[in-house]
Amino acid sequence: MAKKVEKLVKLQIPAGKATPAPPVGPALGQAGINIMGFTKEFNARTADQAGMIIPVVISVYEDKSFDFITKTPPAAVLLKKAAGVEKGSGTPNTTKVATVTRAQVQEIAETKMPDLNAANIEAAMRMIEGTARSMGFTVTD
């Protein structure tokens, strides 16, 4: 019989840099799971994506065992990396801080496709373009 999920914990952790310190430790400690076991496994799985923030969904079962699913990095993080900026605009409709090309948007959409609720790559690109515009980025051909 399948184990019963007791709790779902969602976190965003830098790839390969999970430590028992906050925010990871307290979130997992409340769920009652082995923090060191999680951090070692997470760091091993995400070592190749250094520098990215990786969303992770941890399923905690009744017997305090766990498993986790890593997602693709947030679109905003990928856009900032593609544009080479530290942060988006504070006033995106008046102040544009960077420019991304449609080719970069397509590359990001292809990366994000497994996690997006989009039927095809064009729909995924429109979602990424919307995120870019809301961050004060200009999308060019």
UniProtKB/Swiss-Prot annotation:
Keywords: Methylation, Ribonucleoprotein, Ribosomal protein, RNA-binding, rRNA-binding. One or more lysine residues are methylated. SMART domains: RL11 (SM00649). InterPro entries: Ribosomal_uL11 (IPR000911), Ribosomal_uL11_bac-typ (IPR006519), Ribosomal_uL11_C (IPR020783), Ribosomal_uL11_C_sf (IPR036769), Ribosomal_uL11_CS (IPR020785), Ribosomal_uL11_N (IPR020784), Ribosomal_uL11_N_sf (IPR036796). Signal peptide: none annotated. The keyword RNA-binding applies. GO terms for biological process: translation. GO terms for molecular function: large ribosomal subunit rRNA binding; structural constituent of ribosome. One of its GO terms (cellular component) is cytosolic large ribosomal subunit. Part of the ribosomal stalk of the 50S ribosomal subunit. Interacts with L10 and the large rRNA to form the base of the stalk. L10 forms an elongated spine to which L12 dimers bind in a sequential fashion forming a multimeric L10(L12)X complex. Forms part of the ribosomal stalk which helps the ribosome interact with GTP-bound translation factors. Belongs to the universal ribosomal protein uL11 family. This is Large ribosomal subunit protein uL11. It comes from Streptococcus pyogenes serotype M1. The gene is rplK.
